[in-house]
């Protein structure tokens, strides 16, 4: 009898969890093609995930079904829907862009110069499970760049604990030292293999001129199943008690360097840009 009761409890719990999750898909309203790596955010519960390469994602039912779901994808209008009205297949409307602050044109200059460096000891930063954010570094303009107008490539140092993992890069113009207009209107998705690696991403095809106001390079973690990672760890609670537990995050980790000032580093969280942990990219 005891065995039957235990088995019933397991089946009931499993069934409840299954019904609390739904699979959704995001499609381009015009082409009907999947929209990959869109950010999906439940406002009241601080839950942020991404659609995968096929535009699909699994979303847990929020405590309040009247909560709003925000969908933000590069190249598309932001969509805000009540969870109770959220269809399993959602279409996103492409938007047109007017870039007032950044010039984009054909590149003819073949000379190169590096800006930014890697120095000292680095430390790895994970994304966490529920508090995904963007981490951006500001590169101010210098007169030394007058003869080197176009941004050719970006180099990022990452540490990856799984076989392969993906992340996105975003490029923003600057206004009063803060991130402003998003320059790239398509995903710059990068795949890295296991280990600590320097990865150089060629963006010369975007033909982006270095703005006089400077530019921000932002790193975006992707909350997709293929990036999911767990490991055993000792966890300390608020009372100083230690216990064995499981740490969850999304790979890869971004390697950063601490600096005396964080004025050039910004963190995008809950739809707001704020000064954050200092990090080093290398732009060349």
Regions found by a protein language model. Give the residues of each.
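Extracellular beta-sheet/turn segments enriched in Thr/Pro/Gly and aliphatic residues
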Residues: 85-106, 201
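A short, amphipathic beta-strand motif
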Residues: 22-29, 55-57, 90, 102
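Aromatic- and Gly/Pro-enriched, solvent-exposed loop/edge beta-strand patches characteristic
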Residues: 166-239
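Short, ordered, surface-exposed loop/turn motifs in non-cytosolic proteins
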Residues: 22, 30-44
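A short, solvent-exposed loop/turn motif at the edges and junctions
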Residues: 42, 70-81
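Bacterial Sec-dependent N-terminal signal peptides
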Residues: 1-25
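Beta-sheet-rich sandwich/jelly-roll-like modules and their strand-loop junctions
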Residues: 97-174, 221, 225-284
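Short, acidic Ser/Thr/Gly-rich low-complexity loop/linker segments typical of extracellular
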Residues: 46-56
């Amino acid at each position: 009898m005891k065995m039957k009761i235990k088995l019933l409890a397991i089946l009931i719990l499993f069934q409840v969890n299954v019904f609390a999750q739904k699979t959704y898909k995001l499609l381009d309203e015009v082409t009907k093609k999947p929209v990959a790596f869109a950010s999906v955010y439940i406002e009241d519960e601080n839950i942020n995930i991404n659609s995968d390469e096929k535009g699909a994602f699994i979303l847990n039912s929020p405590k309040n079904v009247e909560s709003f779901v925000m969908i933000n994808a590069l190249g598309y209008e932001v969509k805000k829907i009540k969870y109770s009205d959220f269809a399993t297949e959602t279409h996103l409307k492409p938007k047109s862009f007017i870039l007032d602050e950044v010039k984009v044109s054909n590149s003819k200059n073949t000379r190169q110069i590096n800006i930014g460096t890697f120095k000292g000891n680095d430390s790895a930063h994970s994304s966490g499970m529920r508090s995904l954010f963007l981490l951006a570094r500001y590169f101010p303009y210098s007169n030394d760049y007058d003869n080197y107008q176009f941004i050719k490539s970006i180099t990022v140092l990452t540490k990856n604990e799984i076989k392969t993992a993906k992340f996105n890069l975003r490029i923003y113009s600057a206004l009063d030292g803060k991130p402003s207009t998003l320059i790239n209107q398509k995903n710059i998705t990068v795949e890295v293999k296991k280990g600590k690696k320097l990865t150089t991403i060629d963006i010369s095809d975007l033909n982006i001129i270095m703005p006089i106001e400077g530019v921000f390079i932002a790193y975006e973690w992707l909350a997709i199943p293929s990036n999911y990672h767990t490991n055993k760890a000792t966890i300390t609670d608020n009372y100083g008690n230690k216990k064995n537990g499981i740490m969850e995050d999304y790979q890869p980790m971004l390697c950063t360097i601490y600096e005396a000032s964080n004025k050039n580093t910004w963190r995008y969280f809950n739809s707001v840009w704020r000064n954050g942990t200092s990090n080093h990219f290398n732009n060349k």
